[in-house]
Structure formats: C-alpha cells, structure tokens
C-alpha cells in the first residue's frame, strides 16, 4: 500500500509517499478500512517538526482519522459490515491507503456526507463535543468564545454550541469573518487588532487551542463559574524545525498564567483536554464519537472541507494548515 511518511523532522517537504507493507488481517474486534480520505491535524504538523511527544518514531505514518469503506472484519464483528461507509479514529497510521481500526471506533457515514467530510469528524468533532458537553457542561443561553474559530475544531464547536442554544463568539483573521457569520457565529473577532479582547465577555466557556500568552487572556475573559478548555498549543509553531528555545516563552507564559489559589478565589475552572490520552485510558473513542451519530444524521454536524489534497501533494496540505489559510478541514486523499 502507499502511505505518506514523515521521513525526518523538518519542513513539509520531508513528507514523502512510500510503499509500505499492507497491514495484517484485522484482529478480533477490528475492521479493515480502505481509506478514501484522511484528516490533517495540527498535531501532525507538530509531529513533523519534532514537537509532539506521543508521535511514533521516525520514519512514521501519522494521521488520527479517516473515512472509507470497510473491506474486511475480524472475529466478533458482523460480516455484514463489509462494504459499509464509515468514519474512524485511527490512533496514528491514517495517512495510508489501508488501516485496521477497532470496530468501536467507527461510525457509519451518512449517505449525504462525502468521504472528505467524514474524515473531518473523528478528531475535530469529538474534541468539540468533549470540550463543550463532556467537560464544559454547556447549557442553553451561555456565552462561548472559540479561538481559531475557522479551523476544524473551531467550526465543529460553532455548530455544536449553536445547536445547544449558546451565544458564540469566535476569533479569526478578518478575511474569514463572513464565512464564520454564515456558519452561525454571533460575533467574529479580529485577533490581530491591538486590544481585541477589551470590552468582551464575560464568557461561560472559552475554548483555547492556542496556549502560550493566550491562556492567561482566556482566563481573564471568564465569568465566575466559567470554564476554560485548553486543548492545543498552536503557539508552539516557531519555524519548521524543533526548537525548544523558541517554544520556551510560550510554555512559560502558560505557567505564569495559572495559579490554583487564584482559580479557586475567582471560581474559574481550567480543563486540559487531550483526546489521545482519553482514548488511551478508555481504550476506545466510543464515549465521544458515539454521541455524534445523531448530530451527523440530522445535519447538526456538517463538516466544512477547505481542501482535499492528493497524497503526492501532502507537503501542500501541511503548508496550508501551518499558514492558517484554511476555513475548515484539510484532508488528504489517496
């Protein structure tokens, strides 16, 4: 089979298409998926530059999520599932033509949804659901601020929060504001403007994938009883090679921004969210991907795909994501 391989740490050009052995027959409880689209996430970028500690050793195939067709099943899985269109969490290995995954980590792909849209669901929508509902305890009428609102998780959060009756504000560059408004954002905010945060809030929930200096500001925008869900560190992106020296200021800014005593006094909650860690602990994505079945079938979850990029052009997919040019999901297609 063909796969996109991180051959060494560095810029997008280190991504190469390589022939690799097909996976073995699916084990008990597994299915084999012929991949039609694979999601690209910021964690993949961090793995490529050497700043993602959970990434497999090089040369490696990353990719957390795919959509495709089941072509074989292991013992204990209904043989009738062969031929089923599914989306799936892959726990690495998604940038490939074939993957084996646990059957519990798959969800039927609605006929109305393309494979490219399906590949936008397993990471982005489970993260958004966990942040808003699983841990954020979102209630109707609450005010939510979504950083990086035009990204994959950002758009998923907008859709799920609006469906729950929340008022949603989102940060993005000005060129993306019209699209965010069409997606339902009540107020689009230009984060590049000096003092953009002044006069905003207080918010019940802030979703922060930026980290670094953004962490403290997000905390300051919460009302008492508010919840900050931190699920990313895109501020670590400093060039195309691993540099702890360049990343250190952002890491230190997060430490300076947090004090348990202050959070207790202000009655504010900080929630760290790492879907891979939850997945490892539970052994399945089902607690988070399962509740999305209804949202997928009724159109509440309607993934937006910015670009579907062939495997051979994988460096361009990573470049788009790193440059923050996308509104919605970037996916790879074999």
Model-derived regions: residue spans:
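A glycine-/small-residue-rich N-terminal strand-loop-strand element
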Residues: 47, 67-91
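A short acidic, Gly/Pro-enriched loop at the edge of an enzyme's catalytic core
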Residues: 198-205
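A structural motif shared across PLP-dependent enzymes of the aminotransferase-like
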Residues: 90-103
